[in-house]
């Protein structure tokens, strides 16, 4: 019975992720106590969230390279914008491109005085769990980043953003206290 409940829970998370992955092209702040390996990496001084964000950038650029497109460059301003949105989705308990203050990604960029000519956003979430349906064990930076990027890749709207005419990418990752990772990608042409 417990096994069935766990399978149902995994299917729910996967279905919810897939359904939310179909959002348009515009797409929070807590601590994580029970996610393994959250301490800083002594070699790089990066948090787990930053390592995951780097892997998401790399995987996105691999997709772009396979299509003969230029790579996106990491941008600190866009990272900040993306991280704030991921944190806010957790803090204010919503999952949407329009935030708790009814602001779109472009409005949030304007609020932070970030210049842009084009902007788009992908959001998603994945549990940090031993057996996520469709993803397997997501309890590493490599596997959880692969899971969310593949989810976006299999969603026409998100994929269009990933291969779109953008120059820069910001990635924000935040975890809930019950180990659900929220992801935001912000694409920009400055």
Task: Locate each region found by the language model.
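N-terminal targeting leaders of exported, membrane, and organelle-targeted proteins
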Residues: 2-96, 102, 157-190
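Short secondary-structure boundary/hinge segments and terminal tails
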Residues: 81-82, 100, 107, 127
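A well-ordered secondary-structure block
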Residues: 105-189
């Amino acid at each position: 019975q417990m096994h069935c409940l766990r399978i149902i829970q995994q299917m729910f998370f996967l279905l919810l992720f897939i359904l939310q992955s179909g959002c348009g092209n515009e797409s929070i702040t807590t601590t994580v106590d029970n996610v393994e390996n959250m301490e800083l990496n002594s070699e790089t001084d990066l948090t787990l969230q930053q390592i995951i964000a780097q892997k998401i950038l790399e995987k996105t650029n691999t997709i772009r390279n396979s299509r003969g497109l230029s790579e996106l460059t990491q941008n600190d301003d866009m990272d900040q914008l993306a991280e704030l949105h991921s944190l806010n989705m957790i803090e204010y308990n919503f999952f949407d491109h329009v935030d708790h203050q009814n602001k779109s990604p472009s409005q949030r960029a304007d609020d932070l005085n970030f210049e842009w000519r084009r902007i788009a956003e992908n959001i998603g979430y994945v549990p940090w769990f031993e057996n996520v349906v469709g993803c397997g064990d997501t309890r590493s930076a490599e596997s959880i980043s692969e899971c969310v990027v593949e989810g976006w890749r299999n969603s026409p709207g998100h994929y269009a953003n990933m291969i779109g005419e953008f120059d820069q990418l910001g990635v924000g990752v935040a975890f809930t206290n019950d180990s659900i990772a929220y992801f935001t990608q912000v694409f920009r042409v400055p």
